[in-house]
A protein has these predicted regions:
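DNA major-groove recognition helix of helix-turn-helix/homeodomain DNA-binding modules
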Residues: 52-68
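Short alpha-helical DNA-recognition segment
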Residues: 23-41
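The DNA-recognition helices of helix-turn-helix-type DNA-binding domains
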Residues: 36, 47, 61
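Residues that mark the N-terminal boundary/hinge immediately upstream of a DNA-recognition element
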Residues: 14, 25, 50-53
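A short, Lys/Arg-rich alpha-helix, primarily the initiator
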Residues: 1-21
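Short, charged recognition helix plus adjacent turn
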Residues: 68-87
Length: 87
């Protein structure tokens, strides 16, 4: 699984996809990570959590984080980001 993640909601969707692929409930993932279920809910919603909570959940999913230079977003990424805007 390799995703380019630029926004919190993209991170949330990636975590949710991985959890579902592993057939884990939010409660089961939280237990594996040693965190409360609220952490998983917040992550999947794109809300703020501590870095240590993020790393614990990623580890419980068998994932790791890698830091790369971001560069400019692609036209598709910009279009996707603003697709839901009503303006």
């Amino acid at each position: 699984m390799t995703d380019t993640i630029r926004l919190p909601d993209e991170l949330g969707r990636a975590i949710q996809r991985r959890r579902q692929a592993l057939r884990l409930s939010k409660k089961a993932l939280a237990e594996r990570a040693g965190k409360v279920r609220e952490v998983v809910y917040r992550l999947e919603a794109g809300d703020d959590v501590t870095v240590s909570s993020l790393l614990a959940v990623l580890g419980a999913l068998g994932l790791a984080m890698r830091i790369d230079e971001a560069g400019l977003p692609t036209m598709q990424e910009v279009a996707d980001r603003f697709a839901d805007d009503d303006d």
